[in-house]
Design a protein with these regions (language model features):
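The feature captures the beta-strand-to-loop junction immediately N-terminal to the Walker
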Residues: 34-36
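Conserved ABC ATPase "signature" region
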Residues: 95, 107-122
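H-loop/switch region of ABC-family ATPase nucleotide-binding domains
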Residues: 186-187
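Helix-to-loop junction immediately C-terminal to a conserved catalytic motif
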Residues: 49
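A short, flexible loop at the N-terminus of ABC-type nucleotide-binding domains that lies
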Residues: 1-4, 8-20
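Conserved ABC transporter NBD signature motif
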Residues: 57-71
């Protein structure tokens, strides 16, 4: 599915942000990526999505170079902000995004997904009238409706209500059941413990080897304690 090999990247005077990072996201698996702020998580995601130019290493998606049209239409990136065009209705936004991915949105299916997330009929209103949480839900609804081979979730659940949080957990697992893959970048360890198959830690620009989430929970009681231990081990 997604293969990242020996990727290094820096921002001029700031020096290297990523140092020989490698990561594999298999088909029908959910991988959680954690790490402190500034560790390079968003930089890595931007490289995968070709927002930043790759200078060293390689990234392939579905066996294709990440810059190819085939690779790009296989990835759905749901970011941490709520930047969605306020001049469109929810339906217009979803249907436009679907066309960009080469699929046709079904109005009734979109309506059902919005209703599932407590937004009955909202899809026909301008996004300008949406609250922050509603905009986040709209972004997530797009991911659940488009069924891309790989969905990257980058702190997207911040700001949604608890009912929507549980619905997202359910939808993530359904996506995996359909053979789709996910990369979830989050500080929400409860979310990662409920949904992910593997966890990787990105710290100081270096990626840890993936560990099964279940083994972390069984061995440490949860991701938080495992992270604390790993942090102490890394201190000089």
């Amino acid at each position: 599915m997604l293969d990242i090999r020996d990727v290094s990247f820096g921002y001029g005077r700031r020096g290297e942000v990523l140092r020989s990072v490698s990561l594999h996201v298999p088909q029908a698996r959910i991988v959680g990526m954690i790490g402190p702020n500034g560790s390079g998580k968003t930089t890595l995601i931007n490289l995968v999505c070709d927002v930043l130019d790759l200078r060293e290493g390689s990234i392939t998606m579905l066996g294709r170079k990440h810059t190819s049209a085939e690779a790009k239409t296989g990835i759905m990136h749901v970011g941490g902000n709520d930047d969605v065009p306020s001049c469109l209705t929810g339906w217009e936004y979803v249907s436009t995004l679907a066309r960009l991915y080469g699929v046709r949105a079904d109005r009734s299916e979109v309506g059902r997904m919005f209703a599932l997330f407590g937004m009955q009929g909202v899809q026909d209103r301008l996004i300008d009238s949406y609250s922050h949480g509603m905009r986040k839900k709209t972004q997530l609804c797009c991911a659940f409706l488009l069924h891309c081979p790989l969905t990257i979730v980058d702190e997207t659940l911040n700001g949604i209500d608890i009912d929507a949080w549980y619905l997202c957990v359910e939808q993530f697992l359904r996506m995996r059941g359909r053979g789709l893959s996910m990369l979830i970048c989050s500080h929400d360890f409860a979310l990662l413990e409920r949904t992910t198959d593997q966890i990787v830690l990105l710290r100081n620009g270096r990626m840890s080897a993936p560990l099964p989430t279940r083994s972390i929970i069984d061995g440490y009681g949860g991701i938080a304690e495992w992270y604390r231990v790993r942090t102490l081990e890394a201190e000089p």
